[in-house]
Amino acid sequence: MCGIFGYINYLVERDRGYILKTLVKGLKRLEYRGYDSSGCAVDGDEGEDFIMFKEVGNVSKLEASIKGSNVNKSTKFINHCAISHTRWATHGIPSPINCHPQRSDPHSEFIVVHNGILTNYRELRTVLESRGMVFESETDTECVAKLAKFIYDTTPGVDFTSLAKLVFRELEGAYALLIKSSHYPGEVVATRRGSPLIVGVKSEQKLKVDFVDVEFPEPAEGLPGTPKPTSLHPVFSNPATNGMLRGDKPDLLHRAQSRAFVSGEGVPGPIEYFFASDATPIIEYTKRVMFLEDDDIAHVRDGELHVHRLRREGGGSTTRTIETLEMEIASVMKGNYDHYMIKEICEQPDSLLNTMRGRVNFVNRLVTLGGLESYYDIIRKSRRLIFVACGTSYHSCVAVRPLFEELTNIPVVVELASDFVDRCPSVFRDDTFIFVSQSGETADSLLALQYTLENGALAIGVVNCVGSSISRKTHCGVHINAGPEICVASTKAYTSQYVALVLMALYLSRDSVSRLERRNEIIDGLAEIGEKVQETLHLNAAIKQTAIEQLINKDKMLIIGRGYHYATALEGALKVKEISYTHAEGVLAGELKHGVLALVDNDMPIVMLLPDDYNFPKAWNAFEQVRARGGKPIIITDKKLDNLEGFTIIKVPKTVDCLQGILNVIPFQLLSYWLAVKRGHNVDQPRNLAKSVTVE
C-alpha cells in the first residue's frame, strides 16, 4: 500500500526535466502496490520554494500535470534531492490537499512523504495546534512535517539528523518516511519502522567497501568535556501533554566518514541514490541496494550516506550490507502482453521451474532446502507446525496442509494472520511457525511474527521478495523465486508458494522409509509439472469463450471443491472477486447440506472441481445434489466423464493428487482475467486493493 520513491544526485549534473521524469517513472513502477493519488517535489529556482505537483487518480495524470506546467525544466542541478509518493487514502479522502508530499507551512520549510499509519497522530496534532500550528489537510503525515518545523524553530543550530531523531522518537505506529527541508539543501533523511524502505546506490567508481557502518549515538551522560543536556523543548516535559512528546534527553550524535562512498582522496565522488518502497523502481538504474532496518535513520549529505540508530539499543548488526539484486528490468516490463496478469499467468511454467531449481534432484529423487538445514532436527521435533498467512498465501497453506499431515505426522494448523493477532493464542517454544507472504511485508503477518518470536518459537519465512522484513526477521526460510509479480491479484506467486511448500513437506519427510514410495511419486510429478501447466494454458481460448457466453452477465458464483481442492475453490473465488468484481464463494463440498444448497437453482452460476482422486465419489455425490436442484455447474476435472451432455467440462491434465491443485487453479486465473477484460475493468490494479498490505 502506497509507494515512496526518492532520487538524489551528487556531482552528477541533471536538469529538472530529467529529475521529474525519473520520479514519474519510479512512481509508475510502484503503481502495482495500490494507490489513489500521487505527488512529487523538486527544488525551485534559487531563492524559491520547492515545486510540488499533486494529482488525484493515476500517475499518468501527474505526468500530464508536469508536462503542462510552465516550470523551467532545463534548470540544471549538480546536487539535488527529490521525493515522490503514491498515496492510498487512510486519513482523509483522495484530494490534492491530502496528497503527499505534505508540508509544514505555506513556504514548505519541511516536506514529507510517508507510508504507513501513525497511531498517535491525534495526540500530536492536538499538541501542535495548541502551539499555534495550523493544519490544512486531514492526513496523519502532516503532523510529521509540522513537528519537524516546531523542533527546528525551537532548537537553534540543530542539524538534520539530530532533528530527525527528535521527530521520530515521538512517532508511534508503522511508517516509512522521507523528509526534505529548505533549511538543509541537498540533504534528505529517511527512516522506517514496520514499513519497507530500500536504498539504491549508483556510482561509476567502485565502492571502497560493500557495507555502511551504523553510527550509534554516544550517551550524553558522562562524556568528558560535554555539558549535561537539558530538555530542548518545554512542551516535551509538560505534564499537560500526558507524556506525549516525551522528555527523552538527546543523545550526542557520533558522525564518522562514510567509508563506502569516499574516494582514495577521502572525498565523495559522483554518486546517485534511490530511495524506494521496493526494488522495482530501482533496478532500471542500479542493482546495488541496501535494506534499512526498523529504526534506522538514513541521512544523505554531500554525497555520503550515513545510517544512524534512533537509540543505542537494538539494531542487530553494526553494518548494513550493500547487496546486489538478482533481478532484471525485463521482469518488471509487460513486454508484448496486454496486462501484467496474463503475462504472469503465462510465466508459470518458468516460475515453477525457478522455484525448484537447485533444490530437486529428479534423478536421485532428493529434495534439498539449504535455508532449513541448520534447523532440520528442531523442525522435526516440533509439537505443531503452524502456518500463518493472509489472502492468497493463506490458500496456499490450506492447499498443502493435508500433505504435511500425511508426510510429517506432525499436527498442522493454518491461521489467518489477522485472526491470530486478535486472539493471541498459546504459543509453545517447541512450536514451529511458517509465515507465508509474497511481499514479505504483510502487516498482520509481521505482527504475528513478532508475537511468535516474543514467545520463543521457531519462525520460518516463505517469501518471494529477497530482503523483505519477514525474510530478515525469521530464523530461516525458503525463497519461492517466482520473480517480480506486478499485478495485484497473485497468480504465479500462488503456484510457486504451493510448490515451495510441497518441497518443504518432502524435505521434512526425507528420513521416513515408510513414505519413500509416496515421496518418489510426488517428485516424479514435480518433474512434469512445468509441461502440464503449459498444456493447461492451451485451454485459454475455451475458457475465454466460457467466460463470455455463460458468466459475463452474472454477478455471483459458487465454486465447490473437496480435499486438496477446497483451497482451489477458495483461491478461485478470490480471483473472481478481486478482478471481475463478481461475488464468489468457495465452498467445501461436504458443507453443501449445511446451508449452501439453499442458494442452488437453475440461475446460480456454479463451478465444481471433480478431480480423479480418492475423494471423487464424495465430490460426485455433491455434483448430483446440485444437479437434482436445477444447478448446471461448469466442471473442472482431469477424468473422462460420460453421460454429461449439456454440461461445460474443462478437462485439465492429470498429475499427482497433491499437485493437481496447481493445474486446477489456472482455469480460475484465466476465467477471472477474461471476465475483467470483457467488463472493462483495470485488471492489474483492481479498485480498492493493494499488492503489499503494509497496514492493519
Swiss-Prot record:
SUPFAM superfamilies linked to this entry: N-terminal nucleophile aminohydrolases (Ntn hydrolases), SIS domain
Enzyme Commission number(s): 2.6.1.16
Enzyme class: transferase
Record domain Glutamine amidotransferase type-2: where: 2-303
Keywords from the UniProt entry: Aminotransferase, Glutamine amidotransferase, Repeat, Transferase
Active-site residue list: 2 (for gatase activity)
Domain SIS: 375-514, 547-686
Catalysed reaction, written as an equation: D-fructose 6-phosphate + L-glutamine = D-glucosamine 6-phosphate + L-glutamate
Entry-linked NCBIfam families: PRK00331.1
Known function: Involved in amino sugar synthesis (formation of chitin, supplies the amino sugars of asparagine-linked oligosaccharides of glycoproteins).
Protein name: Probable glutamine--fructose-6-phosphate aminotransferase [isomerizing]
Species assigned in the record: Schizosaccharomyces pombe (strain 972 / ATCC 24843)
